[in-house]
C-alpha cells in the first residue's frame, strides 16, 4: 500500500514537472517566435525607411511595429510591444522628467508617442478629454494600468480648440505632478499627436544646459495676435462641435500691469516654477484674466516666465528653446512645404517630411497621424529606438529591440 502511494506521488510529480516544462518551453518558443517575427518586420521597415530617405515612394498596407494591447496581460504587452523597462544611464536616473499628455482621439498615435517617451524613472500624467469616445477612454485606461508611473489626470476638461480648457488640462496634470513622489526636474507638455525627435538622454542633456531656467519661447505679440487678448472670447460647446468666438467687447487691462507676451503652447518648466504657477497670486490672477481670451496657453506660460524674480524666469529669452518642430502653412518658404496635409494650418507629416524631421534640432515634432501616414511615424520610431539603445549604459534586453 505504501509503495503504491509513493508510486502515485512520484507519477503525479513527474506529470506536473513535464507539464511545467511543456508550458515553459511553449511560452519561450512563442516569445522567441514573436521576437524573430518582430526582427524581420523591423529589418524590412529599416530598408523601406532608407528608400524613403532616398526619395522612393511607399504605400504600406499595414503597420510593421505592431502592438498587442487587446490580447495581452500587462507583462506580455510590455514585452511584445518592446517597452524599455530599465533606466538606461546614471545621468538619466539622476534627472527624471515629468510629462503631461493631452489626448482626445487616435489611440494608435498616442500609444506610439507613449512607448517612445516611456522610461521607468519618469512620471506621466495623461489628460483624457471628456468628449472622447468610450472605446478610446477604455483603451487609454487599459494601457496606463500597466505602468505604475503613469496615470490619468484627476480633473478632466471638455477641451475646446483655442479655449481656456486646453490650458486648464495642462494645469490639471501639473497639479497632480507636483504632488508626485518622483523627484522630477522638468515637466514637458505634449499632445497625443507629438513624437520625439531626440532620445530621453538627449532631452535630459538639453534641459540640463538651461541650468534651472524655464523654456517658454515667445515675444511681444505681433499684430495678428493682439486681438486674442484685447477682446473677450467665449467657448461654445455642444453635442456636434466646439469652438471659440470673438466678441466686440474689450477686455480689462491685464492684472498687476503685466506685459502680455505671445509664444508657443509647448514649454518645459522646472518644478519650482510649476509650484509658483499653481500657488502664487500673480499666476492665479493671470489665469483668471485669461479665461476669456483666445488660446491662452500661447500667452500664459511665456508672460509669467518673462517676469524678473519668478522661479527660473528668462526675461529676455525671445524664441529661445528648440522644443517643437512644426510646419505652418504660412511659412512654406522656410520649411519647403508639407508632404502630408494641413489641419488648422499645421502640417500632418507625410513620408516626404522625414528628412526635414530628422535634421531638426527640436526635441519633438507635431503633428502625426499613424493611420494616415504609418511609415512616417514608424520610420521615426525605429530610428528613435536604435539611437536610444545605442546610448544605453545598461545591458539591453532582447525585447527592447523592434
UniProtKB/Swiss-Prot annotation:
Disulfide bonds: none annotated. Pathway: Protein modification; protein glycosylation. Changing residue 350 to E: In CTRCT13; uncertain significance. It is found in: Golgi apparatus membrane. Residues 24-400 are lumenal. It comes from the Eukaryota. The keyword Transmembrane applies. Keywords: Cataract, Disease variant, Glycoprotein, Glycosyltransferase, Golgi apparatus, Membrane, Signal-anchor, Transferase, Transmembrane, Transmembrane helix. Its EC number is 2.4.1.150. Its main location: Golgi. Glycans are attached at residue 41. GO terms for cellular component: Golgi membrane; membrane. One of its GO terms (biological process) is positive regulation of cell migration. Residues 1-7 are cytoplasmic. It catalyses: a beta-D-Gal-(1->4)-beta-D-GlcNAc-(1->3)-beta-D-Gal-(1->4)-beta-D-GlcNAc derivative + UDP-N-acetyl-alpha-D-glucosamine = a beta-D-Gal-(1->4)-beta-D-GlcNAc-(1->3)-[beta-D-GlcNAc-(1->6)]-beta-D-Gal-(1->4)-N-acetyl-beta-D-glucosaminyl derivative + UDP + H(+). Branching enzyme that converts linear into branched poly-N-acetyllactosaminoglycans. Introduces the blood group I antigen during embryonic development. It is closely associated with the development and maturation of erythroid cells. It is linked to Cataract 13, with adult i phenotype: An opacification of the crystalline lens of the eye that frequently results in visual impairment or blindness. Opacities vary in morphology, are often confined to a portion of the lens, and may be static or progressive. In general, the more posteriorly located and dense an opacity, the greater the impact on visual function. CTRCT13 is associated with the rare adult i phenotype, in which adult red blood cells are rich in i antigen and contain low levels of I antigen. This is N-acetyllactosaminide beta-1,6-N-acetylglucosaminyl-transferase. The gene is GCNT2.
Amino acid at each position: 500500500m505504501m509503495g503504491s502511494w509513493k508510486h502515485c506521488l512520484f507519477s503525479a510529480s513527474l506529470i506536473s514537472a513535464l507539464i511545467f516544462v511543456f508550458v515553459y518551453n511553449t511560452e519561450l518558443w512563442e516569445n522567441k517566435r514573436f521576437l524573430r517575427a518582430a526582427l524581420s518586420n523591423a529589418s524590412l521597415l529599416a530598408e523601406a525607411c532608407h528608400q524613403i530617405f532616398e526619395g522612393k515612394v511607399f504605400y504600406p498596407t499595414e503597420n510593421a511595429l505592431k502592438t498587442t494591447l487587446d490580447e495581452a496581460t500587462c507583462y506580455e504587452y510590455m514585452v511584445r510591444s518592446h517597452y524599455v523597462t530599465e533606466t538606461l544611464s546614471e545621468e538619466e536616473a539622476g534627472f527624471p522628467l515629468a510629462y503631461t499628455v493631452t489626448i482626445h482621439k487616435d489611440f494608435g498615435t498616442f500609444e506610439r508617442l507613449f512607448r517612445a517617451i516611456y522610461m521607468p524613472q519618469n512620471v506621466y500624467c495623461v489628460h483624457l478629454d471628456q468628449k472622447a469616445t468610450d472605446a478610446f477612454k477604455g483603451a487609454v485606461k487599459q494601457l496606463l494600468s500597466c505602468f505604475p508611473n503613469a496615470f490619468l489626470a484627476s480633473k478632466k476638461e471638455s477641451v475646446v480648440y483655442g479655449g481656456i480648457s486646453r490650458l486648464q488640462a495642462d494645469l490639471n496634470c501639473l497639479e497632480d505632478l507636483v504632488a508626485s513622489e518622483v523627484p522630477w526636474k522638468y515637466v514637458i507638455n505634449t499632445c497625443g499627436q507629438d513624437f520625439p525627435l531626440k532620445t530621453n538622454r538627449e532631452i535630459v542633456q538639453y534641459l540640463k544646459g538651461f541650468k534651472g531656467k524655464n523654456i517658454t519661447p515667445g515675444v511681444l505679440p505681433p499684430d495678428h495676435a493682439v486681438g486674442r487678448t484685447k477682446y473677450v472670447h467665449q467657448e461654445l460647446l455642444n453635442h456636434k462641435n466646439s469652438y471659440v468666438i470673438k466678441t466686440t467687447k474689450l477686455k480689462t487691462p491685464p492684472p498687476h500691469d503685466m506685459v502680455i507676451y505671445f509664444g508657443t503652447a509647448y514649454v518645459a518648466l522646472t518644478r519650482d516654477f510649476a509650484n509658483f504657477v499653481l500657488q502664487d497670486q500673480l499666476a492665479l490672477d493671470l489665469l483668471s484674466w485669461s479665461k476669456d481670451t483666445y488660446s491662452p496657453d500661447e500667452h500664459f506660460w511665456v508672460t509669467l516666465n518673462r517676469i524678473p524674480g519668478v522661479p527660473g524666469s528668462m526675461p529676455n529669452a525671445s524664441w529661445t528653446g528648440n522644443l517643437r518642430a512644426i510646419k505652418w502653412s504660412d511659412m512654406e518658404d522656410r520649411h519647403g512645404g508639407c508632404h502630408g496635409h494641413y489641419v488648422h494650418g499645421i502640417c500632418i507629416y507625410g513620408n516626404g517630411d522625414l528628412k526635414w524631421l530628422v535634421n531638426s534640432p527640436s526635441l519633438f515634432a507635431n503633428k502625426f497621424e499613424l493611420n494616415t501616414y504609418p511609415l512616417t511615424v514608424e520610420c521615426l520610431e525605429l530610428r528613435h529606438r536604435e539611437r536610444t539603445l545605442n546610448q544605453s549604459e545598461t545591458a539591453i534586453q532582447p525585447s527592447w529591440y523592434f
